[in-house]
Swiss-Prot record:
Record-linked SUPFAM superfamilies: Ribbon-helix-helix (SSF47598)
Keywords associated with the record: DNA-binding, Plasmid, Plasmid copy control, Repressor, Transcription, Transcription regulation
Originating species: Lactiplantibacillus plantarum
Record family assignment: Belongs to the transcriptional regulatory CopG/NikR family.
Residue ranges of DNA binding: 20-40
Record-level Gene Ontology MF annotations: DNA binding
Name of the protein in question: Protein RepA
Gene3D superfamilies for the chain: Met repressor-like
GO BP terms in the entry: plasmid maintenance; regulation of DNA-templated transcription
Amino acid sequence: MVEVEKKKITLSIPVETNGKLEELAQKYGMTKSGLVNFLVNQVAEAGTIYRQ
């Protein structure tokens, strides 16, 4: 297993957005931080936050 250095952060997001994040994380069997990490990596690979 590869050891990944981690940094704790605090985000202030709307309650509704947090609910969506929790629902998506549960739906795909991920933690909220894992889902955020996945989405950030997807955007980095695509080079944009917009659909192409």
